[in-house]
Swiss-Prot record:
It comes from the Bacteria. This is 4-hydroxy-3-methylbut-2-enyl diphosphate reductase. Dimethylallyl diphosphate binds at residues 41, 74, 124, 225-227, 269. Pfam families: LYTB (PF02401). The lineage of its organism: Bacteria, Pseudomonadati, Pseudomonadota, Gammaproteobacteria, Enterobacterales. The gene is ispH. HAMAP family: IspH. Binds 1 [4Fe-4S] cluster per subunit.
Length: 316
């Protein structure tokens, strides 16, 4: 059985930054550090940080006065941000800069009183945070998930209308929704630069190449990870058997026993140690040496806040 690895896969710059913010805050200030929502959607990462003293909460009211609070990589609404400001808290923002870009687009439309449409998945924390940047009662903010949703919209002024997208969507599905928006609202304005982030696009491109060669595709990522789910869906659309797994223990031998080639990738919030564990598990089932496919090189780095720019080793 051949083992192929998608390239790129795993951590993106936004996830690296968010985890570093929590780790550095723990090193500098000590436990406990409060984090609103899971800092990234990965069980292994969250459990590791929890063991070191991070406390994950959903409501600002759960945070005691004087505590350190970190916003997750998915971003928060203005209402949440304002509630935190009203408290005696030290706040660090781990929102991915590419999510912040979308927040700024929505806030700009809100200031102008222009209606906006967000393409995204209802209930996802990134969507809740992005929708929460709009506050102008003269305009309006709408959420759509599919082309069908577009035709149910009732906007006030089709001449002043813009759209944005969640950063972790399927590139193909989003293209279909955008096509529907442009048909329904010919004057609609989109972002100057695509809102779907580089890491989402690159990992979908990589899993497409992987699925062309593999019989079975394993996607390492947690069930609540949007970008990981999209990778599994894409492999399935290409006619491959695909499984979304948290770790190597999830793999059943029956999944791969008849496969000549198994492909492995990882969502943007899944650490490489989980991929290495998957490779080890597949080798127990008769797999050979893992081979990494060619792919796009990623060199993007997002800096942590200056207050947290410290060599963690200096404070240990």
């Amino acid at each position: 059985m051949q083992i192929l690895l998608a390239n790129p896969r795993g951590f993106c710059a936004g996830v690296d930054r968010a985890i570093s913010i929590v780790e550095n805050a723990l090193a500098i200030y000590g436990a406990p550090i409060y984090v609103r929502h899971e800092v990234v959607h990965n069980r292994y990462v969250v459990d590791s940080l929890r063991k070191r003293g991070a406390i994950f909460i959903e409501q600002i009211s759960e945070v005691p006065d004087g505590a350190i609070l970190i916003f997750s990589a998915h971003g928060v609404s203005q209402a949440v941000r304002n509630e935190a400001k009203s408290r005696d808290l030290t706040v660090f923002d781990a929102t991915c800069p590419l999510v912040t870009k979308v927040h700024m687009e929505v806030a700009r439309a809100s200031r102008r009183g222009e209606e906006s449409i967000l393409i995204g998945h209802a209930g996802h924390p990134e969507v809740e945070g992005t929708m929460g940047q709009y506050s102008n009662p003269e305009g309006g903010m709408f959420l759509v998930e599919s082309p069908e949703d577009v035709w149910t919209l009732n906007v006030k002024n089709e001449g002043k209308l813009s759209f944005m997208t969640q950063t972790t969507l399927s590139v193909d599905d989003t293209s279909d929704v955008i096509d529907a928006l442009r048909k329904r609202f010919p004057k609609i304005v989109g972002p100057r630069k695509d809102d779907i982030c580089y890491a989402t696009t690159n990992r979908q491109e990589a899993v497409r190449a992987l699925a062309e060669q593999a019989d079975v595709v394993l996607v390492v990522g947690s069930k609540n990870s949007s970008n990981s789910n999209r990778l599994a869906e894409l492999a399935q659309r290409m006619g491959r058997t695909a499984f979304l797994i948290d770790d190597a223990a999830d793999i059943q031998e029956a999944w791969v026993k008849d496969a000549a080639c198994v492909g492995v990738t990882a969502g943007a919030s899944a650490p490489d140690i989980l991929v290495q564990n998957v490779i080890a598990r597949l080798r127990e089932f008769g797999g050979g040496e893992a081979v990494t496919l060619e792919g796009r090189e990623e060199n993007i780095v997002f800096e942590v806040p200056k207050e947290l720019r410290v060599d963690v080793r200096e404070v240990e």
